[in-house]
C-alpha cells in the first residue's frame, strides 16, 4: 500500500508543475504560428491531456474490461465539465468566445448524440469504433481548415521577426513536449496508485472507471485548465475541455472498440452515465450563452461567460452524481 500512496503524491506534484509549463508552451506555439489559442486548446492541449484516457481505455479493452474503458471515457467527460470546468470557473470565471458557441459546442452536442445512438443496442462494435474515429478525423480536419481559411480571409500576416521577440519557438516547443510527457507520465503514476488503493479496498471495476480512473485521467485537464484560466488564456481553458471531450467520445472509445469490440456493457452506462454526460454538455452550451452578459469582443459581439455561480452548479451536480454512484455500489 505504501508504493501506491507514494505514486499518488509524487504524481500529483509533478502533474501540477508540468501542466503549468505545458500551457506556457502551448500558448507560445499558438502565438508564434498565428493560430488561435482556442484551436490549439482543442487540438494540442486536448490531445495531450486526453492521452491518459486513450491508453487506459485501450488497455482496458484488450484486457476484456469494457466497463472500465467506457467508464473511463464517459466518466472523464462528466468530470471535465462538472468538476474541472466547475472548479476552474469558481477560481476564475471562464470566458466563452463566439466561435465556441457557434461551432465547437454544437459539434460536441452532435457527437454526444451520436455516441448515445451507437450505444443504444447495448454494444459498441468494431464498425462503431471505426465510425467514431472517422468522425473524429473529420471534426479535427474541419477545425484546422476553418482556422486556416479564416486567417487568409482576414488577411492576417504574422511578422516573424516581431513574433520571435515575443516568444521563442524552440523554448515553447521544449516546454510543450516536456510538459506533455510529464503530464502523461505523472497522470499514469497517479492513476496506478489510486487504482491499486481502490482495489485493495474491494471497489468494483465500473465504479473505479467512473470515479477514480476518470478523475485521475482528467487531472491533466484540471491542472492545465486552471493554469490557463489564471494566466488569462480563457480560449485555451475552454478549448481544452471541448477538445478533451471530443477526444474521449470519439477517439478514446473509437480506439478501444476498434482494438477489442465491446459486445456488451452494463445497462447503467446507457441509462445513467450517458444521460448525465448529455445533460452536462447541453448545460455547458446554455451557461455559455451571452444572455445578460455585457462583455463585448473586438468584433462587437457579446461574449458568454461561465461565472462562479454556474461553476458551483456544475460542482454540485458532480458531487450529487458521485454520491449516487457510491450509494448504488454500497
State each model region's role:
Residues 1-330:
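Hydrophobic alpha-helical segments, chiefly the membrane-spanning helices
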